[in-house]
A protein has these predicted regions:
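Aromatic-lined carbohydrate-recognition surfaces of secreted/lumenal glycan-active proteins
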Residues: 3-4, 57-58, 79-120, 160, ...
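Alpha/beta enzyme core
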Residues: 42-58, 62-64, 132, 141
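Active-site-proximal loop/short-helix segments
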Residues: 6-14, 51-81
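Active-site-adjacent "subsite" loops/lids of carbohydrate-active enzymes
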Residues: 3-50, 204
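Short, acidic/polar
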Residues: 35-49, 114-126, 195-211
Length: 247
């Protein structure tokens, strides 16, 4: 739940001393407690739903990931998990009459974390109020040693398997969970010292890991929207290509 807020500082997250908070990318964040902004976002979503799209997917549906003390509103004693849950619940209520699916992206670590990572993303709280939940399970984004994997980016099958297994296990315990539809890696993480080039073999390894757990839906992300090298050869597995410029 972010937006450049320099022109509207009253609705932005601030430091405890009153200064405008900006994340590491220099982006100011809207206050997630701000119901006026909820209506703004959901109004746009409703307009899109009326235009004929069949799904509304919410990205950055969270608080900023920072360890700095922040000032958000007089309501900030309410749990962050509760705020994100209520927003998505309201989104579902307003969008379902238009016949669209409602989905949300979450950090890849969320299904393997008991809490909310201090950003308001808790697996069961989100999965219970939407149609699809998409953990961003890019192997390059996991720290060395995740699930005892020395270099996650160099082990796409194992990384996706252990990450998705947490999601499947938790959803199986729920009465009515959202369908799990992860984001998987369609790019090469050249910034990592220990990385491999991602092509069709690495893509298929991720898909196979999901399939072994019964997860047959997924989205592929490439930050430059370059999917040609991944799709040169025909595959027996259908591939959903997302034109998402950022996750």
């Amino acid at each position: 739940m972010y937006k450049r807020q320099r022109q509207f500082p009253a609705s932005a997250i601030k430091h405890k001393d009153g200064r405008l908070f900006e994340d590491r990318d220099g982006i100011a964040w809207v206050n997630p407690y701000n119901r006026e902004y909820w209506n703004y976002v959901l109004g746009i979503a409703e307009e899109m739903a009326r235009s004929g799209v069949n799904e509304i997917q919410f990205d950055y549906i969270r608080f900023p990931d920072t360890n700095k003390p922040l000032l958000m509103s007089a309501e900030e004693k309410r749990a962050r998990v509760e705020v994100i849950h209520e927003f998505l619940k309201e989104a579902y209520k307003r969008l379902k009459p238009h016949g669209v699916y409602v989905s949300a992206d979450v950090f890849g670590l969320v299904p393997n974390t008991a809490g909310d990572l201090y950003i308001g993303q808790h697996w069961e709280s989100l999965s219970s109020v939407i149609d699809y939940i998409s953990p961003m399970m890019y192997p390059s984004h996991y720290s060395k040693g995740f699930a005892s994997i020395k270099d996650p980016d160099m082990n796409p099958y194992d990384t996706i398997y252990h990450s998705a297994r947490g999601a499947v296990n938790r959803s199986q315990k729920m009465t009515q969970p959202a369908t799990i539809r992860p984001w998987i890696q369609g790019f090469t993480a050249t910034w990592l010292r220990s990385h491999i080039k991602y092509g069709q073999t690495e893509l298929q390894a991720q898909i196979d890991a999901l399939a072994s757990l019964g997860v047959d839906e997924y989205l592929i992300w490439n930050p430059g929207n370059r999917y040609e090298n991944l799709l040169k050869q025909e595959s027996n597995v259908s591939i959903d290509v997302a034109d998402s410029a950022s996750n």
